């Protein structure tokens, strides 16, 4: 698997951050924050873009935090647990703004700040579970083609997890 050292720039849709290779090709990096230097492994390598995930953070951003959930990075349920909560809200606003401007062509749209939950954990009132091969419920592993059974989720309300 090809690894690159990358300088990240801004948030992108789906929880990734944009970096560019030496030719200016965008690389969408999972697990990074804007302004970081990371070592990343390519998972998709196309002529016009690539996808990668962080294997090592060489220079962390000040907004980086330790993920709360032991499944983070393996489970596909969360994108931003490696980011302090206030920055998570900012990232979501910036992604919506970018999508409306760059894809939608709407330049003068005011995007209000995202309203956060009073609780940084166990706030989600819905979850998109899939059945595992054994009949349990879980989340899809990123970069793998199987569902990971989850007994506890750091962002989902505990009552939902009793299903």
Across the structure, where does each feature detected by a protein language model lie?
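Accessory RNA-recognition modules of RNA-modification enzymes
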Residues: 1-163
């Amino acid at each position: 698997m090809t690894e690159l050292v990358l300088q990240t720039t801004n948030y992108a849709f789906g929880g990734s951050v944009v970096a560019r290779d030496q030719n200016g090709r965008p690389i969408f990096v999972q697990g990074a924050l804007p302004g970081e230097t990371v070592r990343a492994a390519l998972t998709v390598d196309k002529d016009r873009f690539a996808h990668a995930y962080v294997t090592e953070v060489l220079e962390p951003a000040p907004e980086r935090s330790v993920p709360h959930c032991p499944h983070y990075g393996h489970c596909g349920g969360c994108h931003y647990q490696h980011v302090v909560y206030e920055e998570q809200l900012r990232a979501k606003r910036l992604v919506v703004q970018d999508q409306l401007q760059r894809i939608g062509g709407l330049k003068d749209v005011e995007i209000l700040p995202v309203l956060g939950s009073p609780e940084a954990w166990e706030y989600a009132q819905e979850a998109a579970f899939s059945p595992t091969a054994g009949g349990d419920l879980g989340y899809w592993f990123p970069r793998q083609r199987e569902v990971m059974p989850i007994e506890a989720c750091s962002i989902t309300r505990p009552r939902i997890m009793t299903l």
